[in-house]
């Protein structure tokens, strides 16, 4: 058995909840590590969502999901400023297309009050179109939720991880926890490859695997199954598709919670569907699912140009299935002595993350974890080599970067205007990417109109050089997939 040094707290999972937990724990005088099964952070549900920060009127009134949504939403302006992550408060319109839907709006309005959001304004369809001109003429009424916002989920997770690492947190990627045991007051976390971490306390934030791991230390009372959500993304160079607010419709019989939203990067996104699937690896899109998203998006904005869709994707989230829908909630609990679990965390998990982590740390404190302040803690994203891509820098910053490294003058991604210097800097950050998809999430190479047709081979070559491997060894994503098999000459 290969053993890693004893730590105070081991965080299982490197998604948004796990990385937020790691960063918050680094505020204290603690030895902390993150154990992530994939080869990069944010490889699970955190990478496959809309990036919407919900106001908090959807979840059941008074639930942990509802109250933490309101609390977490309120924490994001400060968090995004600290980390330098793109964030914008857009507001949302919850739209009714039928008389019964107006009754539903008032039900959600009461939930908002119960969750601590306050009383939201209900406006007529005409008033809604005054502030969102492209909204359907068939909309009868809408509830305005001004605190709804948007954030880049990819940049958020990476910035959280970098900041945690800069403050002393160790990241062990490719560490898939297989078994957990308790010995002499210490938790032993065994990986599939034989490695072992010894921790006084454990924060189980493993997303889809959290319930399985929790069942090793607590009676198996939470059953989690996979639920898939499909999305479509529109070209950001299509201003005719621009909208001002996040748009939801009051749910009808078969239309689920599909929304239409702007993104911080300028694209428009629509989705998700909500489908039970057999495996957490089933992140394929389907014709039926994508047609559903297109139909609902067009219902909200009838003149939406669907010819501007540049990609589609799906994510799979953890759905609790052994509790009645009306009683379902997020679960954050002490499952055993010194062992806290976050279970069944799905949408709006990103919004709730700061508040859920706050509760999890309180639980660890109640379990005996000493929370002495770390005077060296730095809240800024000092783990980044530089804060923004070259093309987003001021002329003075650009001159300085070019003098230090001429590769900043070599554009490798035309759609997103990313340079070779940006890619090389990204590869040298704390918690750097190891796959092409990892670079994509950090810099947006491959997220533009051409979807990597121009930049993929160029970025792959730069990665091979930085990693010191043959170009054929660079993988596309966490599940593998080589882009090349060798050189032709």
What kind of region is each of these model predictions?
Residues 50-131, 257-258:
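Dinucleotide-binding Rossmann-like beta1-alpha1 core, especially the glycine-rich loop
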Residues 144-201:
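Helical element adjacent to the flavin cofactor pocket in flavoenzyme catalytic cores
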């Amino acid at each position: 058995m290969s053993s890693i040094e004893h730590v105070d707290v081991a965080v299982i999972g490197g998604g948004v909840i796990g990385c937020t937990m790691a960063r918050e724990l680094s505020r204290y005088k603690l030895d902390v590590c993150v154990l992530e099964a994939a080869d990069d952070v944010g490889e699970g549900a955190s990478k496959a969502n809309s990036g919407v920060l919900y106001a908090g009127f959807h979840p059941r009134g008074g639930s942990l999901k509802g109250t933490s949504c309101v609390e977490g939403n309120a924490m994001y302006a400060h968090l995004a400023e600290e980390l330098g992550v793109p964030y914008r408060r857009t507001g949302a319109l919850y739209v009714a297309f039928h008389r019964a839907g107006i009754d539903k709006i008032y039900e959600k309005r009461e939930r908002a009050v119960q969750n601590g959001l306050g009383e939201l304004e209900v406006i007529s369809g005409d008033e809604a179109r005054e502030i969102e001109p492209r909204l359907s003429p068939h909309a009868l009424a809408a509830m305005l939720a001004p605190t709804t916002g948007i954030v880049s989920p990819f940049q958020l997770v990476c910035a959280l991880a970098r900041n945690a690492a800069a403050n002393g947190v160790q990241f062990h990627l490719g560490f898939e926890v297989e078994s957990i045991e308790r010995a002499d007051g210490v938790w032993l976390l065994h990986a599939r490859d034989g490695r072992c971490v010894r921790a006084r306390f454990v924060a189980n934030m493993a997303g889809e695997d959290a319930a399985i791991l929790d069942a090793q230390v607590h009676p198996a009372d939470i059953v989690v199954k996979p639920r898939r959500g499909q999305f479509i993304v529109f070209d950001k160079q299509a201003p005719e598709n621009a909208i001002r607010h996040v748009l939801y419709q009051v749910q009808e019989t078969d239309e689920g919670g599909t929304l239409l939203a702007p993104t911080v990067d300028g694209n428009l996104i629509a989705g998700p569907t909500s489908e039970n699937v057999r495996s957490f690896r089933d992140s394929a899109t389907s014709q039926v699912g994508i047609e559903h998203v297109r139909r609902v998006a067009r219902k909200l904005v009838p003149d939406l140009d669907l010819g501007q869709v540049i990609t589609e994707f799906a994510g799979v989230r953890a759905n609790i299935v052994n509790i009645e829908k009306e009683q379902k909630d997020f679960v954050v609990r002490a499952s055993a002595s010194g062992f806290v679990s976050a279970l069944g965390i799905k949408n709006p998990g990103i919004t709730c993350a700061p508040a859920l982590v706050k509760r999890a740390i309180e639980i660890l404190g109640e379990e005996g974890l000493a929370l002495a302040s770390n005077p060296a803690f730095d809240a800024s994203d000092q783990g980044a080599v530089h804060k923004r891509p070259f093309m987003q820098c001021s002329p003075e910053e650009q001159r300085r970067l070019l003098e230090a490294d001429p590769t900043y003058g070599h554009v490798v991604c035309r759609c997103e205007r990313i340079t070779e210097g940006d890619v090389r800097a990204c590869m040298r950050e704390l918690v750097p990417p190891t796959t092409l998809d990892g670079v994509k999430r950090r810099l947006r190479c491959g997220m533009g109109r051409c979807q990597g047709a121009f930049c993929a081979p160029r970025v792959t070559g730069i990665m091979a050089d930085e990693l010191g491997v043959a170009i054929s060894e660079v993988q596309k994503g966490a599940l593998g997939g080589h882009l090349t098999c060798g050189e032709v000459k």
